[in-house]
């Protein structure tokens, strides 16, 4: 579990991990008042960092949803199966010039960023970003 917050997650370690074919089981964030303004910011920024590091979008989403639900022993989450919780985040990948920062202050330039378009909770449209 990545658990990106104020004290864990460096690009150097993440790159070494990925270069050695060691994918994270779970990509999560540990956002709190000391890191909400950086370096973690939010879950989508954490996911974007892995996208820019070369992890395919499908894997990034699976590691943040399906695998996270399994790690929490919550099989009703992280799936679209009939009878499961009807929660969905509608995401898009924006392209441009983005700078990402890790807990050591190192930066990574990227050309993609995952953004939120809307949210469905319990099968009901809840929010448009």
Per-region residue spans from a language model:
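Hydrophobic alpha-helical scaffolding
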Residues: 3-7, 36, 54, 109
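Short linear motifs at secondary-structure transitions and domain/linker junctions
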Residues: 2-4, 63-67, 92-97, 102
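Structural detector of well-ordered beta-strand residues that form the stable sheet scaffold
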Residues: 1-3, 27-28
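Basic, gly/Ser/Thr/Pro-rich low-complexity segments located predominantly at protein N termini
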Residues: 8, 35-37, 123, 128
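Active-site glycine- and acidic-residue-rich loops that bind
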Residues: 2-11, 71
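His/Asp/Glu-enriched, well-ordered alpha-helical/loop segment
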Residues: 12-93
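C-terminal cap of metal-dependent C-N hydrolases
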Residues: 86-129
């Amino acid at each position: 579990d990545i658990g990106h917050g104020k004290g864990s997650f460096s690009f150097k370690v993440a790159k070494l991990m990925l270069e050695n074919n060691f994918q994270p089981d779970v990509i999560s964030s540990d956002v709190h008042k000391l890191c909400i303004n950086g370096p973690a910011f939010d879950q989508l920024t954490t996911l974007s960092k892995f996208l820019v590091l070369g992890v395919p979008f499908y894997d990034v989403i699976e590691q943040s949803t399906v695998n996270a639900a399994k790690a929490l022993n919550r099989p009703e989450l992280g799936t679209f199966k009939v009878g499961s919780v009807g929660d969905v985040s509608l995401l898009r990948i924006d392209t441009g010039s983005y700078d990402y920062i890790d807990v050591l202050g190192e930066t990574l330039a990227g050309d993609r960023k995952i953004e939120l378009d809307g949210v469905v909770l319990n099968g009901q449209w809840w929010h448009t970003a």
